[in-house]
Swiss-Prot record:
Catalytic reaction list: N(6)-acetyl-L-lysyl-[protein] + NAD(+) + H2O = 2''-O-acetyl-ADP-D-ribose + nicotinamide + L-lysyl-[protein]
The name this protein goes by in its record: NAD-dependent histone deacetylase SIR2
Biased composition annotated in UniProt, kind: Basic and acidic residues: 69-81
Functional description taken from the UniProt entry: NAD-dependent deacetylase, which asts as a key regulator of gene expression believed to help form modified chromatin structures on the genes it regulates. It is involved in telomeric silencing and in hm mating type loci silencing.
Bias type Acidic residues, positions: 45-68, 82-92
InterPro entries: DHS-like_NAD/FAD-binding_dom, NAD-dep_histone_deAcase_SIR2_N, NAD-dep_sirtuin_deacylases, Sirtuin, Sirtuin_cat_small_dom_sf, Ssirtuin_cat_dom
Family listed: Belongs to the sirtuin family. Class I subfamily.
Organism: Kluyveromyces lactis (strain ATCC 8585 / CBS 2359 / DSM 70799 / NBRC 1267 / NRRL Y-1140 / WM37) (Yeast)
Length: 670
């Protein structure tokens, strides 16, 4: 590949690549050595004087410099195309009839008829190739501990050419070929990948085929038209490949294997060849920066089998696991943030901004009741995690939720990392006095600021409480500066120990995640859209051979999950538990245990799960019908800080003095 790129740089520019008109034509001629300048040095003109000869040499040098500049321009100005990922559109190979055992015993080659998988009977170093020179995925060991290594191609890619038309024919690329090539690139690196897949002599069409082999399609119409001009494409299909090597071996009188000649007569213009190289670089970078789905793990049965053998499961959870309890998620179309549009906030996420809270905590406390967790309640999904823990399979539950419901379900503190904190405790932003979170729940439900008893008297000095009559008269109740000192409105306010935007994640997260990702043998992401870093990066930290499963209402397209189970989290958990023969320790399990679920495969590795005879649309309508009041926008009240000049402003932002009993209890708890 490096030699090809070097040869390409030395290749004369085509006439169209330099300029239009006579000037471009002359430049092209000079580059090929057939211009009038060189003709003047023929034997008949040997009497040309030295000065004239020097002038000719100077002109030739100038032309060479101009040519070199033009070469640099085209290399520097050519940009890579936008690439469409099409690996999922490739056909799957049929399972070979000489495999022994059932389909569930093998992995690697997928049957397009049944969706089951089979493993090539060869070892990892067996050279079994296809028309693309790619092999199948080989493994050793049991299903639970197999390590999946991509096969080295039997031989470099070899393009064939029709004898009469002299047009090229590309081998057919299967999904397994593409996945193997992508895995080979990721495991062995760019240099070995190019050395093993490409012949020593190649042209630009080999580069195009490599882009296709990695699962990408070029979008540039001009470039595609140029390729179609030199490629046999009987069906006028943009994807171009027509026959595989097994078909062409029997028609040697029609097709001939071909490698480029040393004279380097590339079928495409240089500008197209340069673009293809840059497109290949872009495709390789995309592959190297993303996870590759496992070819042997894409069915519910694969998930069930792995659950039974896994010992170090990481469960990553989000707000979707609590929606069945009436707690809204955050980022869906019906989620928490979408409902905050009525509040007039520039950015709904401002309610969880540390900077905004410091300036005016009433912004948060006017909506906090909407996300306040129910006490001593948990969903079947929470109990599903507890079940995994009880079977000694749970390495860690990394939860993005702030409701602390996992603890109610019985997940042990050492098995749980609350990545974004929780309502379990609350702390004074001024003196950092800490109490149990449930003690400020009444304040939250009444839209009141909970005030630290130790900072209460000092806060009264800074912020005098105004009566409704004084507020109606327009008197300012804010005293942001006391004796020349700036005092934030959050002075003495108790804040739930949830991680706001602008705050660092708990040290426990950073301490454990580095070790856990190396031990993990199965990752299950549940009820999360994976939009918030650094928690969203966990999927990219897991070793490539570890299966990743998504259980969520909607797909997460920016991640590469091996298996996605789309539906209500409780339903999916019930289906999986049924197939495992396990009981979920939840009061509703007897009902869920006898429920029949339908799993519809919408594409490879993606299933929609819903109760039998109930469509997903019917389930969604039924779910919305029973939404609790706390998800209704009618329960929202504008934050006090947004209507400060209004005479009808709520007085709920005024500090509520704790009772003597409260102070006594608080002092006792310390």
């Amino acid at each position: 590949m490096t030699e090809y790129y070097g040869t390409l740089q030395k290749r004369p520019l085509e006439q169209e690549s330099v300029a239009e008109g006579n000037g471009g034509l002359e430049s092209g001629k000079k580059a090929r050595g057939d211009s009038d300048v060189f003709a003047a040095r023929s034997p008949e003109n040997e009497d040309v004087d030295v000065d004239a000869d020097a002038d000719v040499d100077a002109d030739a040098d100038a032309d060479a410099d101009a040519e070199e500049d033009a070469q640099k321009d085209i290399l520097e100005e050519t940009k890579a195309d936008e690439l469409d990922e099409v690996v999922d559109e490739y056909e799957e190979k049929e399972v070979s009839s000489n495999f022994n055992g059932t389909a569930s015993d093998h992995v690697g080659i997928t049957s397009s008829n049944t969706g089951s998988t089979a493993l090539a009977a060869s070892s990892a170093d067996t050279n079994s190739g296809s028309g693309n020179g790619t092999g199948t995925m080989a493994t050793n060991g049991t299903l639970s501990d197999r390590q999946y290594a991509p096969q080295k191609p039997e031989h470099p890619i070899k393009l064939e050419r029709r004898s009469v038309s002299r047009k090229y024919v590309f081998p057919v690329i299967s999904k397994e070929d593409s996945l193997n090539a992508r895995s080979y690139l990721k495991q062995f690196g760019s240099a070995r990948f190019l050395d093993d897949y490409l012949p020593e002599d190649l042209n630009s069409l080999y580069v195009y085929h490599m882009i296709k082999l990695l699962g990408f399609q070029i979008k540039d119409k001009e470039l595609m038209l140029a390729i179609q001009e030199v490629v046999h494409n009987a069906d006028n299909d943009d994807s171009l490949p027509q026959k595989n090597s097994s078909e062409t071996k029997n028609v040697s009188d029609t097709y001939t294997a071909t490698y480029p000649s040393p004279s380097f007569e590339d079928p495409l213009e240089k500008k197209h060849a340069v673009r293809l190289i840059k497109d290949l670089q872009k495709a390789m970078n995309k592959v190297l920066s993303t996870r590759i789905r496992l070819t042997n793990f894409h069915t519910i049965d694969d998930f069930v089998a792995k659950l039974k053998t896994a010992k170090k499961i990481i469960v990553l959870t989000g707000a979707g696991i609590s929606t069945s309890l009436g707690i809204p998620d955050f980022r869906s179309s019906e989620g928490f943030y979408s409902k905050l549009g009525d509040l007039g906030l520039n950015d709904p996420q401002d309610v969880f901004s540390l900077e905004v809270f410091t300036e005016d905590p009433s912004v948060f406390y006017n909506i906090a009741h909407m996300v306040l967790p129910p006490e001593n309640m948990y969903s079947p999904l929470h109990s599903f995690i507890k079940m995994i823990q009880d079977k000694d399979k749970l390495l860690r539950n990394y939860t993005q939720n702030i409701d602390n419901l996992e603890s109610y379900a019985g997940v042990e503190p050492e098995k749980m990392v609350q990545c974004h904190g929780s309502f379990a405790t609350a702390s004074c932003v001024t003196c950092h006095w800490k109490i149990q979170g449930e003690r400020i729940f009444p304040n939250i439900r009444n839209l009141q600021l909970p005030i630290c008893p130790y900072c209460y008297s000092k806060r009264l000095e800074f912020f005098k409480t105004k009566t409704d009559e004084e507020l109606a008269d327009g008197e300012d109740d804010d005293m942001d500066d006391h004796h020349g000192r700036s005092v934030p409105k959050s002075f003495g306010v108790l804040k739930p120990d949830i991680t706001f935007f602008g705050e660092a994640l708990p040290s426990k997260f950073h301490r454990l995640i580095r070790e856990d990702v190396l031990q993990c043998d199965l990752l299950i992401c549940i009820g999360t859209s994976l939009k918030v870093a650094p928690v969203s990066e966990i999927v990219n930290m897991i070793p490539a051979h570890v299966p990743q499963v998504l259980i969520n209402k909607d797909p997460v397209k920016h991640a590469e999950f091996d298996l996605s189970l789309l539906g209500l989290c409780d339903d999916v958990a019930a289906l999986v538990a049924q197939k495992c023969g396990w009981d979920i320790p939840h009061d509703n399990w007897n009902k869920l245990k006898n429920k029949v679920f339908d799993s519809e495969e919408v594409e490879r590795g993606v299933y929609k799960v819903h109760p039998l005879n109930e469509s997903p649309a019917e389930l969604e309508a039924e779910e919305e019908k029973h939404l609790p009041l706390q998800q209704s926008t009618a329960a929202l009240t504008p934050p006090v800080s947004l209507s400060a000049d209004s005479p009808g402003r709520s007085s709920s932002s005024s500090p509520q003095p704790p009772t003597q009993t409260d102070i006594a209890n608080n002092q006792t708890s310390t």
